[in-house]
Amino acid sequence: MTLERMKRWQKIVLCILCLTALTVLANYLLQRFWAHRDGQFVPDYPRVELTENSDYDTIFLQTGLGRPAVDKLLADGNFQAILDAQDLFFNPPKGECTALLGWFTREDMLETPGPFLADIQPGDILITLSTHTIGWRHGHAGIAVEPDTTLECAVWGADSACFPAQEWTDYTNYAVLRLKDSPPETGQKVADYGLSTLLGVPYHLTSGFIGPKAPDPEAWQFGLHCSYLVWYAYQHFGYDLDSDGGRLVSAYDLLHSDLVEVVQIYGMDPRQFLKEEG
């Protein structure tokens, strides 16, 4: 190898090393700072004393508990759980950014669990915005198939599977949503369909984006990602939860669908949901 050619290769290697270093640095800055600019919400408004006669909006602003959860807790004679939720809503545990796929994809997790899940029914939708990739806070979604079990397509390289629902309280923020004005039987049908058809399906990031948005589940290329799993289960019964109608279904799309109501939120600003309802 001539001296000139050797110098040329040295420059190429040096450029590759510099680009790699810049990529790693950019990813670190995005994941460490940009992704956390709108992380866990802590109320910036006054805490008030709650009573069993407080209106739904006040309880929601103070605890993150929606009407379905409040009704259930009051019917169970468990007003103390509402007060406990208020404590954690205003004084959340410390969060930590942890690795899901190295520094590429990370999750913001609480050091100790947040409020317990007040009311989970089959078919309920669970969402967190704690998951972020290269600074993009895309979140994660799952569907309840039992009061204590969720069906999720959790991570690239793994098939959809069932997980303990209570693990959602480890996230720095989460939401429980339910189809509006529908009987429990509807949610049960969606949950049953998920278990019979969408369990053990490969993770495909481009699901619904390339090819038909809702292909036959028997198609050879059929796959899921977290939000698409939820959307696909509900579209089978005629409910399109994709709020922006695009090809890519995201956790944000599900969270802001007009077809769902809030059962419970934590680490999210309740005012955005009251504004949407208004």
Model-predicted regions and their roles:
Residues L100, Q166-T169, P202-G208:
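Short amphipathic alpha-helical segments, especially helix-boundary/capping motifs
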Residues T2-L100, P217-G278:
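Activation targets extended, charge/polar-rich intrinsically disordered C-terminal tails
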